[in-house]
Amino acid sequence: MLFELNRASRAEILAEARQIAGLALPMMVAQIAQVATSFVDTVMAGRVGTDDLAAVSLGASVFITVYVTLMGVVAALNPILSHHLGSRDRRAFSRDAAQGLWFGLMLGALGAGLMLLLEAPLRHWLHLPPDVTDKVMLFITGAAIGMPAAMAHRALHAYASSLGHPKAIMVVSLLALALNIPLNYILIHGLFGMPRMGGAGCGWATGIVFWFNCLALLTYVSWHRHFRDSRILAGLAAPDWRRFLAFLKLGVPIGLSFFVEVSLFSFIALLIAELGTVVVATHQSVLNFSSLIYMLPQSVATALSVRVGHHAGAGDYRAARFISGVGMLMGLAMAGGAMALVLLLREPIMWMYSADPRVIAMGTTLLLFAAVYQLTDAAQTIASGALRGYKLTAVPMLIHITSFWVAGLGLGMLLGLTDWIVPRMGIYGFWTALVISLTVAGLLLTYYLARASRKRLHRDQGILL
């Protein structure tokens, strides 16, 4: 049986599932709070006007691409810190936790600089009315100011989760969501002496909230009793560039994997623009709902990177392989439930997004594609998380590039926009390619995880393969 789960008792599997769920659930709530923040931005900007909504959508696409890519790089801290804890090297843990804070701040500063540098070419590329373009740039500037804090927060996220205390992340994320709503309103409408920014105020609210996130979580972990034995500021020293290089060696492939995935959906949105507003609106609606479901396997994947990292760091590769298998079972079970939910509630789901019968009709069809790829999407996400726990990131990056850019984007363009293979399929061609790309990624990453975990187990036992 895959990952030799047949050798474990039902009680052992359930006990490990509870351990994973204990880590995953608070992180899932935190991720939902973050998605809800973006949802609030969209709704509040839309209330101001169409131009403001367009500005927020375009500005957010730039911000999210940079944010997700850098978040992937900082995610290297999860397995690094977990390995130190597994090997009981508290000194190395304290050192890298503190250096990770510097690393996040500096990486975020580079990301902020990149976003600001992109403003000039974006003004040239965006063929929009000048007032809309100005709002896009104002949004990007505000969001960029928060980028150093955003990456420092991700470093603190890795620190807290590796110690097995993700509730701190959840509490701060919920507080940030509560703060974002009044901040949006104040900056959009120019209350209390603040300039009236319209929808662009959401970008500045985002930047401010990221600083709140960072400082609040830093305060929490600095004073709460759960972190008494590993105070992050106690190990703070001058930036160590050798440690930064070690973080980058592991983190850059993760960041590229994240970039490949997020850019796939960004490029598809741009490519289907010529198919009309109904197609674009339907695609974005179905994608938004799929992203919400994606929080389930993603939270399990983050928990696995910690749990697998702990045991791999301790040299207990049998436990690491077993945990990977339990996580995969959990993810596939949740994906099966999500698939059933989507299939049964396709029309009500689309009614939440639009009353336009054309959007609903097309959306109910696209949701069939979304239902089909739930299992393989969960498999590729969870396998990636477990592999990060083993500090294996280069091969997953290559698999993601091949799956998403070749099988996903390349095949999608051929099926959706040309007659080269079959008569032009339009939006359905892109979603067919999405299903194929996620299936390829899911199968390859699951195979690689099974093979890599088996090799480490046998090597640990002195067995030559």
UniProtKB/Swiss-Prot annotation:
The keyword Thylakoid does not apply. One of its GO terms (molecular function) is xenobiotic transmembrane transporter activity. It is found in: Cell inner membrane. The chain crosses the membrane at residues 21-43, 58-80, 100-122, 137-156, 169-191, 201-223, 250-272, 287-309, 322-344, 359-376, 395-417, 427-449. Multidrug efflux pump. GO terms for cellular component: plasma membrane. Keywords: Antiport, Cell inner membrane, Cell membrane, Ion transport, Membrane, Transmembrane, Transmembrane helix, Transport. InterPro entries: MATE_fam, MATE_MdtK, MdtK-like. It comes from Chromobacterium violaceum (strain ATCC 12472 / DSM 30191 / JCM 1249 / CCUG 213 / NBRC 12614 / NCIMB 9131 / NCTC 9757 / MK). This is Probable multidrug resistance protein NorM. Belongs to the multi antimicrobial extrusion (MATE) (TC 2.A.66.1) family. PANTHER family: FMN_FAD EXPORTER YEEO-RELATED, MULTIDRUG RESISTANCE PROTEIN NORM-RELATED. One of its GO terms (biological process) is monoatomic ion transport. Pfam families: MatE (PF01554). The keyword Protease does not apply. It is a multi-pass membrane protein. The lineage of its organism: Bacteria, Pseudomonadati, Pseudomonadota, Betaproteobacteria, Neisseriales. It comes from the Bacteria.
